[in-house]
Amino acid sequence: MSEFVAKEMKVRLTFVEEVLGSSPSSEKIYSEYIASKAPDSLDTEDEIEAIGEEDRGVTVFPKQNGKPGVWDYQIKGAFKDACGGLSRVKTTESAKIKAYKKVIDKLIFVEPRFAPYQVNGKLGICERPLRTSGATGERTALAASETLPAGSSVEFTILLFDEKLEPAVREWLDYGKYSGFGQWRNSGKGRHLWDELDTDGNVIGGNNEYLKK
């Protein structure tokens, strides 16, 4: 353990709702998606042009060696989101942290750099309408995201440079039961439970009562 690391927490998140990918995809991936969904309605290039630049992306999961996963900074982003919400509740540990984004950036780290998902089944696609406002007025756009099935999980290690932050980190992990992870998380997508693991992978804490039994 590094001289700067005061505490390590090995964690497993198990998703009780499907997770939506949040990384922008390439236009090539989107073109293939359009062609597979509506091969006879319009020429693919025409349909891509008709959708408009702002509606063009399908958000996906980053992949290494063909396996979907999550980057360390995405997990830290989820911590910031949780801390920002919970800081409004004066009785929480999160409310005690001043300049919480800087604290998470500088004193909390996640390993490995890329954590692969353990996929429960197959990836899918979730389509949903989004209402947007612009110079031409309100319109409804189609958003699409790659999906990870409920029951999937991911493991990673949280490194704390200040062990006084541990209660807040546990609070953020507990918050995942109510507020999700990934794209469209405020709708409940990506809701999860968590286990704290020892070095042998045994469950020693967390809020996942099902896997503790």
PLM features: what roles do these ranges have?
Residues 1-213:
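RNA-interacting cores
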